[in-house]
């Protein structure tokens, strides 16, 4: 039988996903949907531009309401990551910082190991238009730059802060 089986409990665990200043409710909803597909349910929002909660996020979540229902709102990155032991920042460009750079695969392997030890982890994403600025990466002392490889140079946010 194809489709989602809503009678089964949702999986939980894995890293927290932290969206910093997300710009559109639809993007929050699609992030929640991707999280649900991967068995993640800890969504943290830092100062969403269009406020929270969002009807547009619910519409875009396509059944991942349980992720949105648990989503928590934070006033700062520091508050959003305060309970996490390891934080990885996703960025598509060089940051010229003294931070370890990991491939997404290596970061996932590390997180899996830390989570198995009971150490809370999170992945930090910046605003859609500009990405994470260096100040957001410096503020969390535990933050390692997890450099992603976009499918096309056209898909990265503009260079503004580096």
Positions of the model-derived regions?
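Post-transcriptional modification and biogenesis factors for structured RNAs
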Residues: 1-162
